[in-house]
């Protein structure tokens, strides 16, 4: 994310988004720079019209936050899933295992 933020900072300052410029911004922010990621971001952004992306992002509808009641129902559903998993994990009883072993010894 830092690489994108640094790129947006350079873009808003009307500076070229180059490897050196991006590296300088990240270093100034105290972030250790990964050269591979740096090159990938610069290469990817060369093909992107950042102004167009920002305009489209501003026009996108924002998702409505979930209702508090829905979060209360989730733990109950999770507990049911856990109970089902426990039932499935039980497997054969000790008696079934013992009878299986007894058949091995005649």
Curated annotation (Swiss-Prot):
A GO CC term assigned to this protein in UniProt: ribosome
Organism of this sequence: Saccharolobus solfataricus (strain ATCC 35092 / DSM 1617 / JCM 11322 / P2)
Bias (Low complexity) ranges: 66-76
SS bonds (residue pairs): none
Any one Gene Ontology BP term: translational elongation
Name of protein: Large ribosomal subunit protein P1
Signal peptide: none
InterPro entries according to UniProt: P1/P2_N_sf, Ribosomal_P1/P2, Ribosomal_P1_arc
Keywords recorded for this protein, A-Z: Ribonucleoprotein, Ribosomal protein
Keyword Ribonucleoprotein annotated: yes
Family: Belongs to the eukaryotic ribosomal protein P1/P2 family.
GO molecular function, one term: structural constituent of ribosome
Task of the protein: Forms part of the ribosomal stalk, playing a central role in the interaction of the ribosome with GTP-bound translation factors.
